[in-house]
């Protein structure tokens, strides 16, 4: 190996997770794009890792454009009529499995949103299929819920709404980390945006499609 030169040092070298990107250049929406993206993910299994359990991965997921029509139908089942695309946000929230802790975290989230002038429309339990998940991954599996938040009427710039959501995400996380016992916290906001949503977990790349029936 060549010796160090200038500011370079071999210790700076590091590997990274695999990333794929799928888009329709004409802006046409289709579930096929999601299926194609999951296929890309599955073809990057070599970029992930697993331990002695072949069915417990070190993490994999997918970010997609907010599926407005799908979320609209799902929220109707909960008695909620979502606004038009861009006038609400969808978030993926990991809550603790233990009911008491989950409700404590939810209460803090609700109060934080109210303090920031944001209206929570509803929470939706994310359906999952755990049949192919290893015991180690199952032991740390969170309770996954999606939260839907209305954009305040006085906010017309979508970037302003996105900044407000960023503040909510960080403010809530800080409050929960400072008020709930740290050895009991299982709270994490995987994504919170009007534009995109993330589906992820301690999975292998091949498990994402089956684990999340939404996809």
Q: What do the PLM-derived regions correspond to, one by one?
A:
Residues 1-215:
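N-terminal segments that mediate ammonia production and transfer
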